[in-house]
Amino acid sequence: GAKLEGIMNYTKIMSAFADPVVMLFLGGFSLAIMAQKYGLDVTLARVLLKPFGTNPKMVLLGFLVVIALFSMFMSNTATAAMMLAFLAPILATFPEGDKGKIALALSIPVSANIGGIGTTIGTPPNGTAVSNLETYFGMSISFGEWAIHMIPFVLIMILVAWVVLQVMFPFSTKKLEVNIPKNDKPTTWRTYLVWATFAVTILLWATESLTGISSNIVALIPLAVFVCTGTFDK
């Protein structure tokens, strides 16, 4: 058969697996997986949605905000699947003909896509854009710098989506009860470890310009912590 020698050095092939963007997403994915595994996502959803009360318009805003927030650190698909599970029982309580349930249902894909813009790990194209800007134009954009510029845009788009959805699909229901089930997963020291690792990683990502620690290096923290403590396996 034909020899493949000289086509590409194996070190170049292997180096692609250690690409900074790949490491950044591995860190983000590990945080998202652990958040779901130990019920952090359910706990956060309960806490964050509670202040929005029972007014349907405010509940819609609450879902838009929470979904966007989760989508900044989790995949859009995982976020949508999780929030749909929370929203399905609520949609079932709507009277027939109430267009408001369409607004709530659409809040999931709309907000998940908007939220993904907010951080470099929100969606793969963001990381690719950062990598290409540095490679071809010499522009280095940190996690914090991206977030500072894009989160205000996300907030504006959330407000626009909130208004548009209400206008197109007005609520006739006057009160909505949001009952998200409690986290039924046992709380262990690993649960607190995941919380702490999540907080420290996000903090270091947001303060890269102050600490001087690259976001790609910070992404190794959750990977190292979860592997060394066996958290992935438990």
Task: Mark where each language-model region is.
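Interfacial loop-to-helix junctions that mark the boundaries of transmembrane helices
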Residues: 8-21, 139-152, 184-189, 206-218
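Hydrophobic alpha-helical transmembrane segments
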Residues: 22-23, 57-65, 79, 105-106, ...
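Hydrophobic alpha-helical membrane segments of integral membrane proteins
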Residues: 1, 75-83, 118-122, 214-221
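Transmembrane alpha-helix interface/packing and boundary motifs in multi-pass membrane proteins
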Residues: 66-75, 109-121, 204-210
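Structural signal for the C-terminal ends of transmembrane alpha-helices
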Residues: 34-39, 90-92, 167-171, 207, ...
